[in-house]
Structure formats: structure tokens, C-alpha cells
Amino acid sequence: AFPICYEIIKNYNKGKPKEEHFKGIYGTELTLVDDSADITFRAKDDDLRNTTYVVFDTETTGFNAGGKDQMIEIGAVKIANGEIIDRFDDFINPGRPLPQKIVDLTCITDDDLAGADNEANVTKRFLEWAEGLPMVAHNAKFDMSFVDMACKKYGLPEFSNTVIDTL
């Protein structure tokens, strides 16, 4: 393994100034962390230790927010001082049967959605409930793509909250 590591480092350093050279420390195991990845977007100066924030997730009919897919559930909690102070959980009726792969993935069925409101109304209620608070989600870009598309599709105000991605 050392000869392979040596060759990789030698090729990486080729043509770089000496102060930018990478040096291997043989006999150690290191983990490289990509600290350049953006985990926050639409950022404002929010300190989650001192503010109320929302943790949320969406379930959808598929993976294409800009295509035929849409949200089928928005679930969220408001957190203040480390405690849940409020909850939001609404199913959304997509007006068509769910694909079986989505039923298998989410355990949400057509029967669950039968009496649910439409995407426009649920999204509007969610925006009002979130009231501009910072938002936290795992794989937030996916969830926000559906929220943003719903806002655009139904003429709702643009969602401009700070968003933090835990992925």
C-alpha cells in the first residue's frame, strides 16, 4: 500500500509549489473531511442555540420536483431551547394513485391520502406555520426542491428561510 500511496502523492504534488505539497505520514490512518461543502443555504445570521427553528421532511410521489412528481406529506417540528414546542404533519392528496415503489418506500398508501388536502393548500399552511424560521432537513436540497416548486407552481411567496442540510 505504501508504494501506491507514494505514487498518488507524487502525482498530486507534481507542478505545485512546495508549500502546497501533500506529505504522507506512513503508518497512520487519516480521514479527509470536505469542509468546503455547503450545508447552509439562504443563510442569515441565525444561531440555532438561541432561536426557534424547524426540523422538517417531505415525502413525495417520486424524485423529480420539476416534472410530474409532487409532495404527499410534509412533517415538521418547531424546536426552542432544545424542546419540541409545535408539530406540523399533513398528508397531501396528489390526485392520482401512488407508484408501488413509493408505497414500499414510505409506507404511505392511497387510502392514507384519500381525504387529504391538495398540495397548494398544505404548502401554504406550512409556509405560514414555519413563519420565516430557520429550517433543518436531511438532504435539504431534495426537500426544498419540492417546496420551492410548489411555491412557484401555485403562486405562493418564495420560501426564503435559512436552510441547514444535515446530510
Q: Where are the regions that the model predicts?
A:
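Phosphodiester-processing cores and adjacent nucleic acid-binding clamps
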Residues: 1-59, 78, 129, 140-141, ...
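Conserved non-catalytic scaffold segment of RNase H-like nuclease domains
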Residues: 49-160
